[in-house]
Amino acid sequence: MAIQKKHGKGRLDKWYKLAKEKGYRARAAFKLIQLNKKYGFLEKSKVALDLCAAPGSWCQVCAETMPTNSIIIGVDLAPIKPIPKVITFQSDITTEKCRATIRSHLKTWKADVVLHDGAPNVGTAWVQDSYNQAELALHSLKLATEFLIEGGTFVTKVFRSKDYNSLLWVCNQLFAKVEATKPPSSRNVSAEIFVVCRGFKAPKRIDPKLLDPRSVFEDVAGPAPNNEAKVYNPEVKKRKREGYEEGDYTQFKEISASEFINTVDPIAILGQYNKLSFEQPKNGDVALAALDKLPETTEEIRLCCADLKVLGRKEFKLLLKWRLKVREIFGFPSKKTQKAAVDEEVAVVENMDEELRIQEELQRIKEKETSKKKRERRRENEKKQKEIVRMQMNMTAPMDIGVEQEGPRGEGAMFRLKTIDQNAALNKIAKGKMAVIKETEKPKDYDFGSDGETDESDEEADRLEEELDNLYDQYRERKAAADAKYRAKKARKENGDDEWEGVSGDEEKGSDDDDDEELEVDSSDDDSDSEDGESGKKLITDLDGQPEEKDGLSKRAKNFFSQGIFAEIPGLLEEPESEEEEAQEAELVEAVEDLKVTKKEKKEAKETKAKSKKAAEESDDDDDFEVVKNNEDDDWENVEKKKKNGRPDIDIITAEAMTLAHQLATGEKTSYDVIDDGYTKHAFKDRDGLPDWFLDDESKHDKPHKPITKAAAQAIKEKLRAYNARPIKKVAEAKARKKFKQAQRLEKLKKKADMLAGDDGMSEKEKAASISKLMASVAKKTRRAPIKVVKAAGSNKGLQGRPKGVKGRYKMVDPRMKKELRAMKRISKKK
């Protein structure tokens, strides 16, 4: 296996090798050396503070370059190995503990240079990484303002992003000179740049918002477009190529002329859109048709609306005047009519509407309830505060603490029946294993040979069977709550794909009964109907004894809606049905039954029509094309896709289906054989009266196993392998991008060729030569220049920078590298 050579971040990096040769802990040391060579700030400094210093290469450079007896402090989250003449400690630069440690080391000194070469953990979205880096640089700047001497230097690393300008603006407020540079040792593929800030102003007071990331990097909304300048001064307007608008990537914008008449801001439409259209939409527009037929809509107006971008100030004024005239004709309110209406409204006082009165009443009730809750909360807090004060003053024993005695629901919550009865607590108590079993007077006989009277009166067996069904239903509910596939299967069983043919009278009656069904453990089948109405009994009984009505309204809600303001609202309270409504309901049921009969007749007519049509097509062999009529009788809910020959498009995905299809195709089986195979001992099994748990378990084993062939299984495997062999999304997108770029190049080439072909100053020979030259330039593949190998010997030994006489890409080689490559090959062979 060939060894992959690494470029950029690999071992062959020049600065990496130089760092190893000179004993630096990281290649980043050369970045500081080159920055100091350009600006010269380390030689004059006596105190240096290195933030995010690990592994300590910048501290090494400071110790070598700065004068003797200088104070160098390095801090980082990661531990730093000891460095001579350098004080290092481990801390977070955003905490107060780090500031205190730095103060203890500096004492009364101030730092001449503050360095920051840190970066957060990257790997998420680029926007998040760049923001984290800018935020870290701002924190280091905040720390530098506390310890930097007046006229000092601050060097930090930042990423090129949208937050870069904001950070640079903050640096300009605090320093005299701010420059951004990129040293040669920084990789070209990296987005990092270094900002060197010199001449610290040392202000006496700094606004906290100036060093707050939330304020500095806050997104500022762009200025609103000046549409008035586009309309009233189109000649002076300067185009600013700022790209597309957010969410709108179309260059040509068109709007209906009727919308221009109806809008309240016509200048914005004239400044943003390209055309006012008079074309009718598909569904039709009455206002646009009337606008098109008005005599005020002259030919000049139509020409001006055709292209708004070429109009001048005069034409825009003409369109605005035309709009005012049309609005006056259509009866839209103008400025004069609005002023008159305002004067009249001042004089006339209208009565409050019924709807507004209801809304105000509801708002008042809501505010009253909110204030009541606030008062209760305040009293509870005051009570807790008093108890705490009593405890602190040793006025009570710990066992008498009121807060713990009362519990989370307050004092006496255990004996509040209203709280207990919430969320159908009574039904939960009476359900499941906690149900009360009624005592029987006489033991029951479970022998199968007993007489008929004892079998019919066997209430205990019925109760046990009902309890078993109840427990099985609870087990299924728990299983459904844990398994998503089970829930989906259950939903498919309940909601079939049958055709909906309306609601009959019997179904309407049964739907209400199904919603109210509940499992009663301590009741039999005979008295279950009588106890259905009593299942809603509560622990608290009203003294007035009025039963709750079926409309779902409580007594309090009913009293509220019985006020006079709700009397005139139709349909709010239930009214008894009249005889006419009952007759209409009976007619509706009859119509649904008739509809079912007519649908069956239509279906039979369709089959006969299809047979006759097929016979006619077979007889007519001279036609070259097939005429397919639109079948208006197709059901819109039939989502099954059909082919042109009328057969359903079925995807074969199992080996059993593939075996059956192969047998039908080869003639081993006919359709009648398949129908005969369906008549088995499992086809007409009597399932009435069997419990659900037995049917669910039996359904796993009562299905016949159909044989499959080896060829069918192999065909299904090949089909799945073809599905899996499809390219991934990234590969498909890359191919699509490549194809799109090729289409763009061909489009540009076509335009250039058309321009050359239409040039009258060139002969046909010159045109052909130019077009062939263009084609050759497109087909020509650009080859990268080969990398030149330069031996690090003689004059090139220990050379820093590009060797003399070498252009383009190159790499330095030496005997040491050759030995390392041989050793790597030898090690890889052993593995």
From Swiss-Prot:
Reaction catalyzed: a ribonucleotide in rRNA + S-adenosyl-L-methionine = a 2'-O-methylribonucleotide in rRNA + S-adenosyl-L-homocysteine + H(+)
Q: Which residues form the active site?
A: 157 (proton acceptor)
Reported EC number(s) for this entry are: 2.1.1.-
Q: Which UniProt keywords apply?
A: Coiled coil, Methyltransferase, Nucleus, Ribosome biogenesis, rRNA processing, S-adenosyl-L-methionine, Transferase
Feature: compositional bias, Acidic residues: 448-470, 496-533, 574-592
User: Which segments does the entry list as coiled coil?
Assistant: 349-396
S-adenosyl-L-methionine keyword on record: yes
Gene Ontology cellular component list: nucleolus; preribosome, large subunit precursor
- Family annotation (HAMAP family): RNA_methyltr_E (MF_01547), RNA_methyltr_E_SPB1 (MF_03163)
Task: Give the family per the record.
Answer: Belongs to the class I-like SAM-binding methyltransferase superfamily. RNA methyltransferase RlmE family. SPB1 subfamily.
Quaternary structure and partners: Component of the nucleolar and nucleoplasmic pre-60S ribosomal particle.
Name by which UniProt lists this protein: AdoMet-dependent rRNA methyltransferase spb1
- Species whose genome carries this gene: Neurospora crassa (strain ATCC 24698 / 74-OR23-1A / CBS 708.71 / DSM 1257 / FGSC 987)
